[in-house]
């Protein structure tokens, strides 16, 4: 009897286990095929595929178990993105085919599998034949056949190497103080990557963006040699497939989906000084005065959480800051803009205005029983605004009025992963999703992005034509439309500095160009050498900001002794000299999505040496200025010079052959930097802040090329308002034709008049510079001139510093700032 009872129990347990077991289900045989104006809908017993053409280079693949009209809300894509009818379609017995001007999508019928190829039939990307797109319960995965030589780049704010092959990553925004250099996930999610491989002798590249905000997982051949894959733990499988013949083309297509930056205020491109925290007001003013006394250029000072009354947002601590408006006005007179931190948590406190309004207007995230969710952060127990509710976004934006009225122009969104003590935000918490409803599982990754959106839209409206500056820690694909991003609470170490370099490069590939890291490291205390090296590198970052944790040693540029102060001053002076080049690069980013800080993989994706651990940290600012970072203890390094044009040492004009590797000196005061032949780099005179006018001369540095045609845009506007949208800008194209020995300044477009009246053209590396040149057919004299980008360090130490400034001898001509096309011939 006992034996029978045990057998019955065992049989029941096995039956239950069988019910629990969820087998992988992939898309099976096509049961119906329905073409529509923009693509095709294919149904199987397992699910439905809707393929939609958006452009010759972009096709959206949507796999769902629901109807075609099911919820397709996306915060990542532009709201005005429209599908296309420009394609041909045909059906055979075994496949359905869509052909655009750039690529071919073939969908096999039994089973439904995806293959992308070029117009000439070369394979771009295809499903793993056995799995395709599959479900295990609610989890959905697309498996792609792994090609032997395939490399993967992108993924945004991720640790690891430049080439993601052999690695796996999770997208789930995570507050990770002092994250290790191999941590994953951290603060931000951008589920986009670029694949690179050779097929039939052709170099092929493509991009895949998975538009699903649930927790997701990407596998680039980690623990297997059969497939790459991307997985969402719930929701539909929606991905955009992008094909182009260049990485810049893929980035441009990707950002046509997710959007591009609007031009930030020019002052936000100056140096930014932050710490946790500057207070009281006298200390803030002392920091500002010290920058000016020491002639170290800077534009922004931050106030961290100690400016608030008991950490409550939209309040001031009256003891520490009795007159915020007066302090901010004084800072403004000294050329500083002020940025303040704003976290999402709103303290549960009777009489606190933000709390009372949020409860009364029903604006907070909720439990399923309709009570407001409460979690602990800096102020104590808090409610959290539901930024997927349009009413909340409007209220939030209006809540900045008092800050705007006292003169705040920078708004720093932190703790918006969202972060709470305990790191266990309950999954059952409900989000509005524009009235469609959903849980924290879907809303978590877009929370920070929608907070940044609400902050940007609200402050933009309040500033009435003036540009706000927004900085966020957390985000999702598309966050670049609203905010700059920094890489969170990093550590004062060489490894973290080098990791930050890789992450900025990867963020740029993922369509997020306005990025930076905490110079010097947020946690820990950097050595003198580490801070010197870090600020040299950080001076080239799109967002150049120093920051440090509470109770840590000071990390202002003068905090490490005279030598480091001189190094910091030199590199920040250089940043301000380069603002015409940097701002023009920001304009390019706003038009094409191209990053300012660029991995070498953008221009040289199939050069295997750039993925070498020795060279993967090299990057360019714009297209032509290459930085070869080194750590704080290296005094020389090996540099790789890619491409087909010569490279010139930025400080001496020493010439390096393309395709070579060479050892170069890297003393602490000289970060290795090189300019590619054909590059055109506009600069201005040194200023202490962007509110100062530089001299009336714009210095245009041209570097000799072996052959070919290159160009450089120079873009100006008022740097403060949105008047450029109505034509108040100056946009000039400079073309250098090495073969024809010609430099052409095209007539500027736009109706903004720059204060520059003269252009000094400085020729670097021209072996046969004529004694005279023709400007629009009229002969002009060429002058010899010495130029230097760095001043000698004070109190020269013959064992540790340069004996003098590094001067270069160049040829120079001067022309009036062009109003019409101007051609220079030699």
Segment roles from a protein language model:
Residues 16-258, 264-267, 274-276, 281-283, ...:
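N-terminal accessory segment at the very beginning of proteins
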């Amino acid at each position: 009897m006992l034996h029978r009872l045990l057998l019955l129990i065992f049989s029941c347990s096995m039956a239950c286990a069988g019910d629990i077991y969820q087998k992988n289900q992939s898309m099976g045989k096509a049961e119906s095929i329905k073409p529509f104006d923009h693509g095709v809908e294919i149904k199987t017993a397992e699910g439905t595929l809707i393929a939609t053409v958006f452009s010759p280079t972009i096709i959206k693949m949507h796999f769902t178990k629901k109807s075609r009209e099911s919820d397709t809300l996306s915060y990542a894509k532009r709201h005005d993105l429209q599908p296309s009818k420009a394609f041909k379609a045909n059906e055979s017995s075994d496949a359905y085919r869509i052909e655009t001007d750039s690529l071919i999508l073939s969908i096999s019928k039994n089973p439904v599998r995806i293959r992308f190829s070029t117009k000439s039939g070369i394979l771009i990307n295809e499903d793993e034949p056995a799995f395709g797109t599959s479900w295990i319960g609610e989890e959905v995965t697309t498996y792609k056949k792994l090609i032997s030589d395939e490399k993967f780049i992108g993924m945004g704010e991720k640790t690891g190497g430049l080439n993601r092959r052999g690695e796996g990553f999770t997208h789930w925004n995570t507050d990770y103080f002092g994250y290790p250099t191999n941590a994953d996930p951290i603060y931000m999610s951008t589920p986009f990557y670029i694949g690179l491989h050779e097929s039939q002798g052709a170099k092929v590249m493509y991009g895949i963006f998975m538009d699903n905000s649930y927790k997701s997982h990407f596998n680039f051949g980690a623990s297997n040699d059969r497939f790459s894959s991307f997985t969402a733990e719930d929701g539909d499988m929606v991905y955009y497939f992008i094909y182009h013949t260049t990485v810049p083309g893929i980035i441009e297509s990707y950002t046509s989906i997710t959007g591009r930056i609007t031009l930030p205020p020019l002052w936000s491109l100056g140096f930014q000084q932050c710490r946790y925290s500057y207070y009281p007001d006298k200390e803030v003013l002392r920091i500002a005065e010290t920058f000016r006394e020491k002639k170290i250029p800077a534009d922004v000072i931050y106030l961290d959480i100690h400016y608030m009354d008991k950490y409550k947002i939209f309040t001031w601590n009256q003891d520490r800051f009795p007159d915020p408006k007066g302090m901010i006005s004084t800072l403004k007179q000294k050329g500083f803009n002020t940025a303040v931190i704003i976290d999402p948590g709103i303290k549960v406190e009777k009489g606190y205005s933000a709390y009372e309004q949020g409860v009364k207007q029903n604006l907070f995230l909720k439990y399923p029983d309709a009570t407001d969710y409460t979690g602990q952060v800096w102020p104590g127990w808090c409610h959290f605004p539901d930024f997927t509710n349009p009413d909340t976004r409007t209220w939030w934006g209006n809540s900045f009025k008092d800050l705007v009225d006292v003169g705040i122009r920078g708004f720093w969104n932190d703790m918006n992963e969202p972060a709470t003590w305990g790191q266990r935000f309950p999954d059952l918490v409900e989000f509005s999703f524009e009235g469609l409803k959903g849980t924290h599982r879907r809303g978590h990754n877009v929370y920070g992005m929608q907070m940044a959106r609400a902050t940007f839209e609200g402050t933009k409206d309040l500033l009435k034509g003036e540009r706000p500056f927004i900085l966020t820690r957390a985000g999702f694909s598309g966050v670049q439309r609203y905010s700059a991003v920094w890489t969170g609470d990093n550590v004062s170490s060489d490894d973290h500095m080098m990791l930050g370099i890789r992450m900025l490069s990867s963020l740029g590939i993922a369509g997020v160009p306005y990025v930076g890291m905490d110079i010097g490291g947020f946690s820990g205390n950097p050595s003198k050498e580490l801070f010197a090296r870090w600020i040299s590198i950080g001076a080239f970052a799109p967002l150049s900001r120093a920051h440090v944790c509470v109770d840590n040693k000071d990390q202002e540029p003068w905090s490490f002794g005279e030598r480091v102060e001189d190094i910091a001053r030199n590199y920040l002076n250089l940043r301000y000299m380069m603002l015409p080049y940097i701002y023009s690069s920001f304009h390019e980013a706003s038009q094409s999505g191209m990053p300012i800080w660029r991995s070498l993989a953008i221009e040289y994706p199939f050069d295997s040496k750039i993925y070498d651990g020795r060279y993967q940290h090299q990057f360019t600012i714009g297209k032509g200025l290459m930085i070869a970072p080194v750590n704080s203890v290296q005094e020389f390094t090996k540099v790789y010079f890619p491409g087909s044009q010569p490279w010139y040492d930025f400080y001496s004009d020493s010439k390096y052959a393309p395709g070579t590797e060479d050892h170069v000196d890297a003393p602490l005061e000289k970060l290795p930097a090189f300019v590619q032949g054909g590059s055109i780099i506009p600069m201005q005179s040194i200023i202490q802040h962007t509110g100062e006018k530089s001299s009336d001369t714009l210095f245009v540095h041209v570097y000799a090329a072996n052959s070919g045609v290159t160009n450089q845009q120079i873009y100006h506007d008022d740097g403060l308002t949105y008047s450029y949208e109505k034509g108040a800008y100056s946009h000039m194209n400079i073309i250098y034709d090495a073969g024809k020995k010609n430099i052409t300044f095209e007539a500027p477009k736009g109706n903004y008049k720059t204060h520059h009246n003269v252009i000094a053209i400085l020729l670097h590396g021209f072996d046969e510079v004529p004694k005279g040149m023709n400007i629009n057919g009229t002969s002009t004299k060429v002058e010899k001139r010495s130029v230097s980008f760095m001043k000698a360090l004070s109190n020269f130490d013959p064992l540790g510093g340069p004996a003098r400034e590094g001067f270069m001898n160049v040829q120079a001509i001067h022309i009036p700032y062009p109003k019409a096309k101007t051609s220079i011939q030699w």
